[in-house]
Amino acid sequence: MTTFESNVNIDNEQKVADAIQNQVGNSIKVSESLDFDYYIDRVLFENDGIVAWIEIKCTDTYEYCMSSYYKISLKKIKRGIDWGESTSAPFYLAVNFKDGIFITRITKECMKNYPIGWGGRKVRRVKGDQEPMIAIPISEFVSLRNFTIDKVYY
């Protein structure tokens, strides 16, 4: 499998996954990294049921309040929402900023209010690093310390 993440990226993501695991408790488990085809990093599960999908991002450049928005690939967010809707489980974005881990739930409804533009990495590694981006208001994130999972069962 081709990977676009360095060992440092993988280690940082695992640290965030471990912090999420500590926050949600023992009955809910954080999965190992999902295959690249999912476009989303992890699921949270309880017994055999998926209770949430989660995308994890890490930045060592920005502090939480440095900008009004956190920008991320529109395709990645759409995929997370699609997985969430198809499994009746919420989709979350967790970002490890320089000053802490913050998390937000993203739905199709709230996404309609987010600005969409063009952006991405300034130094291209592969074709497609510049792409449609969605800007999620920082005000919608909460500190992981204050996070509780919205478990939805059908």
For each of these PLM feature ranges, what is it?
Residues 37-39, 49-53, 86-88:
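Short connector loops at helix/strand junctions that flank enzyme active sites
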